Amino acid sequence: MALDQQAKAKIRAEYATVEGDTGSPEVQVAVLTKRIADLTEHLKVHKHDHHSRRGLLLLVGRRRRLLNYVQKRDINRYRSLIERLGLRR
């Protein structure tokens, strides 16, 4: 369940710290959050799709590690990101 280029570009534009920013933790977490939301909706319909469920858990773990990194580096950026994404951490 990959995102199309337009969806990624929209997310990058919203969460980028500078022009052309594709690799900052904020952008990565935002893209992962969108993919997680899409996979969650898929799994509501296809309850027995265990391969996608494993992929979802891997994405959640990757997002958690990135959020831990941001939290250790700059707590204010972390709090801002959590608030903007609407996450419960």
Swiss-Prot record:
GO MF entry, a single one: structural constituent of ribosome
InterPro entries referenced in this protein's UniProt entry, alphabetically: Ribosomal_uS15, Ribosomal_uS15_bac-type, uS15_NS1_RNA-bd_sf
GO biological process, one term: translation
Pfam family, one: Ribosomal_S15
Superkingdom of source: Bacteria
Cellular-component GO terms for this entry: cytosolic small ribosomal subunit
Keyword field: Ribonucleoprotein, Ribosomal protein, RNA-binding, rRNA-binding
Gene3D superfamilies: 6.10.250.3130, S15/NS1, RNA-binding
Function (record text): One of the primary rRNA binding proteins, it binds directly to 16S rRNA where it helps nucleate assembly of the platform of the 30S subunit by binding and bridging several RNA helices of the 16S rRNA. Forms an intersubunit bridge (bridge B4) with the 23S rRNA of the 50S subunit in the ribosome.
Family to which the UniProt record says this protein belongs: Belongs to the universal ribosomal protein uS15 family.
NCBIfam families, alphabetized: S15_bact
HAMAP family: Ribosomal_uS15_B
Subunit: Part of the 30S ribosomal subunit. Forms a bridge to the 50S subunit in the 70S ribosome, contacting the 23S rRNA.
Protein name: Small ribosomal subunit protein uS15
Organism: Salinispora arenicola (strain CNS-205)
